[in-house]
Amino acid sequence: MKKITTGLIIVVAAIIVLSIQFMTESGPFKSAGLSNANEQTYKVIRVIDGDTIIVDKDGKQQNLRMIGVDTPETVKPNTPVQPYGKEASDFTKRHLTNQKVRLEYDKQEKDRYGRTLAYVWLGKEMFNEKLAKEGLARAKFYRPNYKYQERIEQAQKQAQKLKKNIWSN
């Protein structure tokens, strides 16, 4: 009887552990693909300005606007190039052109202009956050995309404290 009870406890414990691993997709049930269904990897084929890029999606060009940041204008019609706009654009070109990036979408995937909205990851680094940290973008969020708001705002505060680029005055 004692042997059966011990065996039953071991089986129940194993079922619980495997169930938890299955629900969290860890252990032997971990997905081989992307870590999140809201993420995809693309090659950056062109940089429009500091916060807008074009990626190759299955042979088609896709215009992408980075969520949570707003860099000074450089290409907006009827708008002069704003201070640090060229620096932000050059920074993005230097880091992202011809690079494979991982895109992470939030709740709304397109803006009113039809651009894809995403967080851009270069390796393990979120590029949107990097722009704010370098003082080359202001944190700017629109409903309903707030996933990394606190993180990007913290990066901006750090740049402000250090008086980097757009915060230098």
From Swiss-Prot:
Q: Which reaction does it catalyse?
A: Endonucleolytic cleavage to nucleoside 3'-phosphates and 3'-phosphooligonucleotide end-products
Q: What Enzyme Commission number does this protein have?
A: 3.1.31.1
Entry GO MF terms: endonuclease activity, active with either ribo- or deoxyribonucleic acids and producing 3'-phosphomonoesters; nucleic acid binding
Q: Which UniProt keywords apply?
A: Calcium, Endonuclease, Hydrolase, Nuclease, Secreted, Signal
* UniProt xrefs under InterPro entries: SNase_OB-fold_sf, Staphylococal_nuclease_OB-fold, Thermonucl_AS
Annotated signal sequence is 1-26
Q: Which residues form the active site?
A: 65, 73, 115
Q: Which SUPFAM superfamilies does UniProt cross-reference here?
A: Staphylococcal nuclease (SSF50199)
Can you say what this protein is called?
Thermonuclease
Which species is this record about?
A: Staphylococcus hyicus
Species classification: Bacteria, Bacillati, Bacillota, Bacilli, Bacillales
Q: Which gene encodes it?
A: nucH
